[in-house]
Amino acid sequence: MTVQMEYEKDVKVAALDGKKIAVIGYGSQGHAHAQNLRDSGRDVIIGVRPGKSFDKAKEDGFDTYTVAEATKLADVIMILAPDEIQQELYEAEIAPSLEAGNAVGFAHGFNIHFEFIKVPADVDVFMCAPKGPGHLVRRTYEEGFGVPALYAVYXDATGNAKNIXMDWCKGVGAARVGLLETTYKEETEEDLFGEQAVLCGGLTALIEAGFEVLTEAGYAPELAYFEVLHEMKLIVDLIYEGGFKKMRQSISNTAEYGDYVSGPRVITEQVKENMKAVLADIQNGKFANDFVNDYKAGRPKLTAYREQAANLEIEKVGAELRKAMPFVGKNDDDAFKIYN
């Protein structure tokens, strides 16, 4: 399947004109979507449960309501609460207030694709999924460009769902740099696979394994940390900027030769088969059900995984080394918090 990048000129209909927009949730993505849309001239209110997010939204100048109140007032409702709480939030506070002709949006297809949330047939369902964290969605918008986004339609009750999704993407700044049309199935499954097999799960497991190999062979933990973790950003930045080609042009011949010779010894066909098994568990819903069931049980598995990860030797070594590198970790930690 070949997809074509679309831009502001391709957003033909100002579908959000005259619409009351409710952003549900005011965390990482919520604050960015809401502020960008407001700055794009849209009529935005916030729906959120009492707490830090509620207070922050009011502080930022938004009319802020309970989730149920905001849903009743709005024509277009974007649900940007964490995936695991969306089902109960939708069933208790959003669904009873929906009306025919409303539009409901998401930034990730998880709950719609796996059918944890079922929206009435007379309501549009769309997606705007920026390919970056909320603080970058906001910052790049303020700088005059944006973060690329995927958009999709799951249900088109009014015949206007695609226009709403594209206009939403334009409003948050994504159409300045590029939009790609997708489906809920494709976005959800690819996004989860990327996170689990490569970007988060695969990467951290690779780094930890490399650290263990070096330290178990007698090398100093501090030096091992620099070799397998600290330098990762330098390499990833080069790949991000110009693909594998730019990275390989920027490293030594020794490193490049070692890349070709040893990379396939680490990432073998068996690793690829393991990746296929990860993808299968995503496609058949096993991962989604395990994740949701763990949340409903009080997160025992997630809590145990977090405790185990916090006690890794590489984390302890890294924490000490970063104290001596004041230029590392200067980002505002608050920008990365997600308030429920």
From Swiss-Prot:
<dbReference type="Pfam" id="PF07991">
    <property type="entry name" value="KARI_N"/>
</dbReference>
<feature type="binding site">
    <location>
        <position position="191"/>
    </location>
    <ligand>
        <name>Mg(2+) 2</name>
    </ligand>
</feature>
<dbReference type="InterPro" id="IPR036291">
    <property type="entry name" value="NAD(P)-bd_dom_sf"/>
</dbReference>
<comment type="pathway">
    <text>Amino-acid biosynthesis; L-valine biosynthesis; L-valine from pyruvate: step 2/4.</text>
</comment>
<feature type="binding site">
    <location>
        <position position="227"/>
    </location>
    <ligand>
        <name>Mg(2+) 2</name>
    </ligand>
</feature>
<dbReference type="GO" id="GO:0009097">
    <property type="term" value="P:isoleucine biosynthetic process"/>
</dbReference>
<feature type="binding site">
    <location>
        <position position="191"/>
    </location>
    <ligand>
        <name>Mg(2+) 1</name>
    </ligand>
</feature>
<feature type="domain" description="KARI N-terminal Rossmann">
    <location>
        <begin position="3"/>
        <end position="182"/>
    </location>
</feature>
<feature type="binding site">
    <location>
        <position position="252"/>
    </location>
    <ligand>
        <name>substrate</name>
    </ligand>
</feature>
<keyword id="KW-0460">Magnesium</keyword>
<keyword id="KW-0028">Amino-acid biosynthesis</keyword>
<dbReference type="InterPro" id="IPR008927">
    <property type="entry name" value="6-PGluconate_DH-like_C_sf"/>
</dbReference>
<keyword id="KW-0100">Branched-chain amino acid biosynthesis</keyword>
<keyword id="KW-0479">Metal-binding</keyword>
<comment type="similarity">
    <text>Belongs to the ketol-acid reductoisomerase family.</text>
</comment>
<feature type="active site">
    <location>
        <position position="108"/>
    </location>
</feature>
<comment type="pathway">
    <text>Amino-acid biosynthesis; L-isoleucine biosynthesis; L-isoleucine from 2-oxobutanoate: step 2/4.</text>
</comment>
<feature type="binding site">
    <location>
        <position position="49"/>
    </location>
    <ligand>
        <name>NADP(+)</name>
    </ligand>
</feature>
<dbReference type="Pfam" id="PF01450">
    <property type="entry name" value="KARI_C"/>
</dbReference>
<dbReference type="InterPro" id="IPR013116">
    <property type="entry name" value="KARI_N"/>
</dbReference>
<protein>
    <recommendedName>
        <fullName>Ketol-acid reductoisomerase (NADP(+))</fullName>
        <ecNumber>1.1.1.86</ecNumber>
    </recommendedName>
</protein>
<keyword id="KW-0560">Oxidoreductase</keyword>
<comment type="function">
    <text>Involved in the biosynthesis of branched-chain amino acids (BCAA). Catalyzes an alkyl-migration followed by a ketol-acid reduction of (S)-2-acetolactate (S2AL) to yield (R)-2,3-dihydroxy-isovalerate. In the isomerase reaction, S2AL is rearranged via a Mg-dependent methyl migration to produce 3-hydroxy-3-methyl-2-ketobutyrate (HMKB). In the reductase reaction, this 2-ketoacid undergoes a metal-dependent reduction by NADPH to yield (R)-2,3-dihydroxy-isovalerate.</text>
</comment>
<dbReference type="InterPro" id="IPR014359">
    <property type="entry name" value="KARI_prok"/>
</dbReference>
<feature type="binding site">
    <location>
        <position position="53"/>
    </location>
    <ligand>
        <name>NADP(+)</name>
    </ligand>
</feature>
<feature type="binding site">
    <location>
        <begin position="26"/>
        <end position="29"/>
    </location>
    <ligand>
        <name>NADP(+)</name>
    </ligand>
</feature>
<dbReference type="GO" id="GO:0000287">
    <property type="term" value="F:magnesium ion binding"/>
</dbReference>
<keyword id="KW-0521">NADP</keyword>
<feature type="binding site">
    <location>
        <position position="231"/>
    </location>
    <ligand>
        <name>Mg(2+) 2</name>
    </ligand>
</feature>
<feature type="domain" description="KARI C-terminal knotted">
    <location>
        <begin position="183"/>
        <end position="328"/>
    </location>
</feature>
<dbReference type="GO" id="GO:0005829">
    <property type="term" value="C:cytosol"/>
</dbReference>
<feature type="binding site">
    <location>
        <position position="134"/>
    </location>
    <ligand>
        <name>NADP(+)</name>
    </ligand>
</feature>
<dbReference type="InterPro" id="IPR000506">
    <property type="entry name" value="KARI_C"/>
</dbReference>
<dbReference type="GO" id="GO:0004455">
    <property type="term" value="F:ketol-acid reductoisomerase activity"/>
</dbReference>
<dbReference type="InterPro" id="IPR013023">
    <property type="entry name" value="KARI"/>
</dbReference>
<dbReference type="GO" id="GO:0009099">
    <property type="term" value="P:L-valine biosynthetic process"/>
</dbReference>
<dbReference type="GO" id="GO:0050661">
    <property type="term" value="F:NADP binding"/>
</dbReference>
<feature type="binding site">
    <location>
        <position position="195"/>
    </location>
    <ligand>
        <name>Mg(2+) 1</name>
    </ligand>
</feature>
<feature type="binding site">
    <location>
        <begin position="83"/>
        <end position="86"/>
    </location>
    <ligand>
        <name>NADP(+)</name>
    </ligand>
</feature>
